[in-house]
Regions:
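C-terminal interaction segments
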Residues: 219-268
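Acidic/His-leaning functional-site neighborhoods
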Residues: 196-225
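Alpha-helical transition-metal enzyme core signature, strongest for iron centers
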Residues: 9-16, 39-54, 78-85, 89-103, ...
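Short, contiguous alpha-helical
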Residues: 29-70, 117-179
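A glycine-rich beta-turn/hairpin centered on an aromatic-Pro dipeptide
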Residues: 165-207
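Short, helix-capping/interhelical loops that line the mouth of catalytic, cofactor-
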Residues: 1-4, 52-105, 109-114
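An N-terminal domain-cap segment
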Residues: 1-44
Length: 268
């Protein structure tokens, strides 16, 4: 199950609290690395997701087409764009503990193994919601908000294995479904991904099977045409197209093939 991901969320929260204690008034309006969002919108995204899990907004009276994941996130952020920083912090504080309790409950069977669709991201067991948010919060804090990639120079603890690994597991789990057609078209031979440092491991991206989906088993030595190596932390950035993989990855083997796959990859 994903109890480790719940613990990751608690650890990341401690670092969020350090940012809250040190952030200046002017920092809220600074552009984050997340395209189109200031630091304020990143916090609004985090707090609004907690609120919706615990106290969901009633659905519209008239049936509407389901939103894509990124559009749904923007829909929650939009009404909070003009909130004060204190209003965002109050919402975050109000719902965090209940949200963690909810995440913990999702680790218990039979709920944990219940498969649910997540907009256009694919279908996953409910226990992996904790992994999804461990990825989300780590990425937004350590990549979008904090230097060197984000705008704020604030002292926090470095990301460790306990913080990073659950989010990496979400990224790997999402690769087959989030870009099902795009990746199936370009993954024609095994490609090894070796992530070093905290949160790291080795996976081999395999061509699509009869179901049309690639697979990403957690092992190496599967006849890979190339091996792509970077830190796990950097994977959070380049795997989501926040940065160019060329700045942090090395390739051993068929560089042209690896380049085609990496240029296509875009995890949400």
């Amino acid at each position: 199950m994903s109890s480790q991901a719940v613990e990751a969320l608690k650890l990341i929260h401690k670092q969020v609290e350090k940012v809250i204690q040190q952030i200046d008034d002017g920092d809220w309006a600074r552009d984050s690395l997340c395209e189109g969002w200031r630091v304020q919108e990143v916090f609004a995204h985090m707090s609004s997701n907690m609120k919706e899990a615990i106290n969901p907004t009633p659905p519209p009276e008239t049936e509407q087409e389901p939103l894509k994941a990124e559009d749904a996130m923007e829909a929650l952020v939009a009404p909070r764009r003009e909130w004060t920083a204190q209003e965002l912090l109050d919402e975050y504080a109000q719902y965090f503990e209940s949200w963690i309790e909810w995440m913990t409950a999702l680790q218990e069977e039979p709920t944990a193994s219940t498969m649910v669709p997540l907009a256009d991201l694919g279908t996953y067991p409910l226990h992996m919601m904790a992994n999804a948010f461990a990825f989300d919060h780590y990425c937004h804090l350590y990549v979008d908000i904090l230097a060197p990639e984000g705008p704020l120079v604030i002292a926090v603890d470095s990301g460790n294995d306990e913080m990073i690994r659950p989010g990496i597991e979400w990224m790997i789990a999402g690769m087959p479904q989030m870009q099902a057609q795009e990746l199936a078209a370009v993954v024609t031979r095994p490609l090894e991904i070796e992530l070093t440092g905290p949160g790291g491991g080795t996976w081999t991206v395999q061509p699509a099977g009869h179901d049309g989906l690639i697979t990403v088993p957690p092992r190496a030595n599967l006849g890979a045409s190339a091996t792509v190596t970077s830190t796990a932390h950097d994977f959070v950035s380049w795997g989501t197209k926040r940065s160019d993989w060329r700045s942090t990855c090395t390739i051993d083997g068929d560089e042209a093939y690896a380049t085609t796959v990496l240029d296509t990859l875009n995890i949400i």
